């Protein structure tokens, strides 16, 4: 019976623990018939305990067995309670050990947050930090915000977001004129190059023909216009024949112009700009009020 109860308390890894049958409140007395008819010899009715050795067989042997069987559960109960208390103590010791092992693993992996108390100012406000419970406290209004990275700033500036830092030297209208001015300057450069190529030959041809004076100048201007017009037509036909190549070339040139035009001015450039503006204002004041200058 003692081994059966001990087996019920011990854990069984191979299956469920079988429910223990409740023990009877008291053992049923067994009637022992010590008559000579049922017993084969005198040894059958011998006492089972060491205390009864040497006593003669009497009629009260059944009562002694009943009292011995009743004393067995009372002896077994404190032993079972001691085993249960030892098992609970071992579980209590295992829990802090396992918790310390888990905390050591988390610290080795870098997953455990370092807890610290928030510093309390004189006004009673807490500074942002990690709360003792392990959660992040909400940053106050005076806490510094995270600065965006350089890449995010560049992307925001390229997209023209409203929160991006403004690097424009002038207003938006002045910035929009950069691309139009570039196209205009390219056309002017092309036209001036064509005029420079055909101006001298036309002038020499008119001089050989003896066409000088106002008539020669008029003919020189008209012939230069026609030569530049045909030259522009030839160049534009070449550009329209290969639009992708020239568009890439124009885009690269425009990117270089925008990078130079929209860059932030340095300290020296800003100082020179302020000095030039101050000189211009002084000159305007002197021009407006000549009497004050004297």
UniProtKB/Swiss-Prot annotation:
Pfam families, A to Z: DUF4661 (PF15576)
Biased composition (Low complexity): 35-44
Cited InterPro entries: DUF4661
Modified residues (Phosphoserine): 34-35, 71, 90
Chain spans, region Disordered: 1-148, 268-294
Basic and acidic residues: bias regions: 52-62, 73-92, 278-294
Keywords noted in UniProt: Phosphoprotein
Record-given protein name: Uncharacterized protein C6orf47
Gene name of this polypeptide: C6orf47
